[in-house]
Amino acid sequence: RKDTLDNRGYIRYTEYEINPLFKGSAAVQEYEIEFYDKADGSEPAKEFILSLDKKMQAKVLRTVALLREEGPFLREPYSKALDDGIFEIRTKFGSDITRVLYFFVVGKKVILTNGFIKKTQKTPASEITLAKQYRADYLARKESSK
């Protein structure tokens, strides 16, 4: 059975559920986590996370949960600023290294844009450029819906 995110933001596993991605309020002002969705409805960051094996998914989602709690105060080794308001979630499991890129928007909201398996020392410029394109699209669609 393939593990999937359900409509509540849970990744459902045979043995347990992990839910750091749900929308809601808590006693502490937490950041809302959203996946960027392209015009065709696809969600690159969600699709990337779901493509990972269960253990790496769990590590990525734990870091997303930390981001939800800490927002822009989350720093290395969990998060790092890259360029022009684009940040990365940093996850390592064994020899595998993954990154999920994101940006902040007004209203304590984090938008996860895209992810990749890191194979070089430096984050590929193409991934940062893609995150910037997704951010521009997100903000343009947000503005046009007002």
Each model region followed by its residue ranges:
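Residue-level signal for short, function-critical loop segments
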Residues: 116
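Basic, Lys/Arg-enriched alpha-helical interface segments
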Residues: 1-97, 106-110, 119-146
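ATP-dependent carboxylate-activation loops
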Residues: 113
